[in-house]
Amino acid sequence: RVLFPCFFGSALKMDGIDEFVAGFERYVREPEYDSEFGARIYKVSHDVQGNRLTWLKVTGGEFKAKTMLSGTARVGADLGESKIDDDGMWHEKADQVRVYSGAKFTTVDSVVAGTVCAVTGLTRTFPGAGLGKEPDGVNPVLQPVLTYTLLPGECDIHACLVALRELEDEDPLLHVVWQPHLEEVHLQLMGAVQLEVIQQMMHDRFGLDVSFGPGGILYKETIAHPVEG
């Protein structure tokens, strides 16, 4: 970039709006897209019916509903019944293609390059993943450093695990680990603030009032012999 435009005005008073629109039209270039299909996933969420939504931007070609897609399986993810080949790739069919406007959406048959949409029917996608010609993005620089034990109280621990798996699906910085021999759920995350957010979301979205044990350091390596640091 060699030009950084600066505009002054007020939308409330309709002051400077015409100049802004004219400058926007003059200086902004319309992207040029390839004919080969590509898309970048930037978010995963769930609608009020519990349908899993994969949010993506089409970066090339055309994307149609019912298209068979392939992608790299997320490291450490529970693959369930998804079909995974020898190269660690999943294969699933996209169901609905939705174009949202606020909370409302329109179901469409296809979208072209440059369109942002939400797709149902995909269960193994994750934020940052690429589809088609798009490569996967780099892993987040920040990684969970603390581990906490879930204290379900009077809540069913398996219901808590299902809810936490859904939150893990949406947040790349949350890792949920089920310890079957202990019948415990462990959370790997960034710290107390993220823990408070998760606790509130468990209450608001799932009606589960839970707490957590004291945090511990998540060690990435095991010391093989005594050393001096």
Where are these predicted regions, by residue range?
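Structural and coupling elements of P-loop NTPases
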Residues: R1-G229
